Amino acid sequence: MQNFWCKNPQVAAEAVRCRWPKSAEHTIFIADEICRGRYLFQDHWEMEPTHTAVDFGAEIAGIDWAAVPFGDPEWLYAMNRHTSLVNLAKAWLYTGDDHY
């Protein structure tokens, strides 16, 4: 499946970093926030952008997967679509840092 999109993901990641550095930096920022346990949905496909992060703490066991912060049920749906995994994977490709 990987080769369906590109033969070398590292080359694609480098191209993004060179051509759209602000996009790569934003992805890395979001991934860093996720690693801290702070969730902020700002990617255009997730939901209406959120401006206040919800902080569950850095331990994954502390995440409340049924939380509805600010009374917004769309937040719950966005959280459980696990798009955070996409941002973590992209940050890893951009940086090579295994903590993602």
What is the predicted function of each stretch?
Residues 1-100:
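Extracellular glycan-targeting catalytic surfaces
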